[in-house]
Curated annotation (Swiss-Prot):
Heterohexadecamer of 8 large chains and 8 small chains; disulfide-linked. The disulfide link is formed within the large subunit homodimers. It catalyses: 2 (2R)-3-phosphoglycerate + 2 H(+) = D-ribulose 1,5-bisphosphate + CO2 + H2O; D-ribulose 1,5-bisphosphate + O2 = 2-phosphoglycolate + (2R)-3-phosphoglycerate + 2 H(+). This is Ribulose bisphosphate carboxylase large chain. Substrate binds at N114, T164, K168, R286, H318, S370. Transmembrane segments: none annotated. It is found in: Plastid, Chloroplast. PANTHER family: RIBULOSE BISPHOSPHATE CARBOXYLASE, RIBULOSE BISPHOSPHATE CARBOXYLASE LARGE CHAIN. RuBisCO catalyzes two reactions: the carboxylation of D-ribulose 1,5-bisphosphate, the primary event in carbon dioxide fixation, as well as the oxidative fragmentation of the pentose substrate in the photorespiration process. Both reactions occur simultaneously and in competition at the same active site. It is an enzyme of class 4 (lyase). The modification N6-carboxylysine is found at K192. Gene3D superfamilies: Ribulose bisphosphate carboxylase, large subunit, C-terminal domain, RuBisCO large subunit, N-terminal domain. The keyword Lyase applies.
Length: 455
């Protein structure tokens, strides 16, 4: 008799297990599956589970040397998608032992590394992940988190204000520093390097760091508030990235920045560890996210990338605006904003949250609203995002007819007016425009901004 039965086999025999009870230590994934015509849902769901865990396309004799039952991914539930005949959600459970501790890189390589090019599927999208407590605890997470950041900055009870310095490419370091100073002097908490500002011929990183640090200290001395500028440490190698972070620390600045998707999760986690060890805050930009998350039926939802960032580490992350120039549906956005900030988030399908997620006291991340927003959006932003957020007005500060500092003043006045109105019990949704108008009566800077950007 032969030791094992050779040949190609159906995945669903081994990998579709509807009776399976998920364990607390399993990593759970929700995939939106669009199979090729004629492939039944069970087979497609099982194929996803197999290809992203222990499966290969044929029987191999080395299967006999291990326990498949202990190590295989299992498709344990399939549900139809309302309004889509050819789509369904496949739920897959992965045993914890398949993953290296503290490695977002390995988690993604395992779960989404190979299976997305699979022939039996027309399209595949990872909608959500449930990270078990045991796995969360192997990550350091954000270098500092929301509470520690507020304590370092001594700013409480309101969202923080930021601004990306434009034009993003072409300024010299000295002029760039001047723009930073004007914004901070006017009343912003932070200014930001654009995500594509690294170290180009017209402005090398070291010069920029120096002039921005000078701008920061000057603005701090003038205003009596702590100021920050997100110095982009993203670089072509990890060594160079850490070198830039070290220089930022030597200058004594409070915060650096990283593009976590283009830079990669390994680099990002290294930088996050450095930042915690050296008291630097870490601002994360999500350049390249739309390549991965924009298609509705293929790729990965941003909430998965956001969860991954909280594990890998970052104190701020860009997460859409709900109101500006970039797309983002309100409930769905609020769903992953809460996943970033809160310690425990209940499953809620109306907000796109497929699993209850317990972060077991991992620090939270501040969501950053950025992109096409201006003073008229302030009431809505204050209401939607609440206190724990960073509101970033690039053109909405620098586009002010009187210059950067008055633009910053306008934003700060608008924010303080909205926070005060909210604290007095007024309804920002219905009275927002009126609140801004009232505030603009005693702030010429805000009045000028209201003129430029009509409601």
């Amino acid at each position: 008799s032969v030791g094992f039965k050779a040949g190609v086999k159906d995945y669903k025999l081994t990998y579709y297990t509807p009776d399976y009870e998920t364990k607390d230590t399993d990593i759970l994934a929700a995939f939106r599956v669009t199979p090729q015509p004629g492939v039944p849902p069970e087979e497609a769901g099982a194929a996803v589970a197999a290809e992203s865990s222990t499966g290969t396309w044929t029987t191999v004799w080395t299967d006999g040397l291990t326990s498949l039952d202990r190590y295989k991914g299992r498709c344990y539930h399939i549900e139809p998608v309302a309004g889509e005949e050819s789509q369904f959600i496949a739920y897959v459970a992965y045993p914890l032992d398949l993953f290296e501790e503290g490695s977002v890189t390995n988690m993604f390589t395992s779960i989404v590394g190979n299976v997305f090019g699979f022939k039996a599927l027309r399209a595949l999208r990872l909608e959500d992940l449930r990270i078990p407590n045991a796995y969360v605890k192997t990550f350091q997470g954000p270098p500092h988190g929301i509470q520690v950041e507020r304590d370092k900055l001594n700013k409480y009870g309101r969202p923080l204000l930021g601004c990306t310095i434009k034009p993003k490419l072409g300024l010299s370091a000295k002029n760039y520093g001047r723009a930073v100073y004007e914004c901070l002097r006017g009343g912003l908490d932070f200014t930001k390097d654009d995500e594509n500002v690294n170290s180009q011929p017209f402005m090398r990183w070291r010069d920029r760091f120096l002039f921005c640090a000078e701008a920061l200290y000057k603005a701090q001395a003038e205003t009596g508030e702590i100021k920050g500028h997100y110095l982009n440490a993203t670089a072509g190698t990890c060594e160079e990235m850490i070198k830039r972070a070290v220089f930022a620390r030597e200058l004594g600045v409070p915060i650096v920045m990283h593009d976590y998707l283009t830079g990669g999760f390994t680099a990002n986690t290294s930088l996050a560890h450095y930042c915690r060890d050296n008291g630097l805050l870490l601002h994360i930009h999500r350049a390249m996210h739309a390549v991965i998350d924009r298609q509705k039926n293929h790729g990965m939802h941003f909430r998965v990338l956001a969860k991954a960032l909280r594990l890998s580490g970052g104190d701020h992350i860009h997460s859409g605006t709900v109101v500006g120039k970039l797309e983002g549906e309100r409930e769905i956005t609020l769903g992953f904003v809460d996943l970033l900030r809160d310690d425990f988030v209940e499953k809620d399908r109306s907000r796109g949250i497929y699993f209850t997620q317990d972060w077991v006291s991992l620090p939270g991340v501040l969501p950053v609203a950025s992109g096409g927003i201006h003073v008229w959006h302030m009431p809505a932003l204050t209401e939607i995002f609440g206190d724990d957020s960073v509101l970033q007005f690039g053109g909405g500060t620098l586009g002010h007819p009187w210059g950067n500092a008055p633009g910053a003043v306008a934003n700060r006045v608008a924010l303080e007016a909205c926070v005060q109105a909210r604290n007095e019990g007024r309804d920002l949704a219905s009275e927002g425009n009126q609140i801004i108008r009232e505030a603009s009566k005693w702030s010429p800077e805000l009045a000028a901004a209201c003129e430029v950007w009509k409601e």
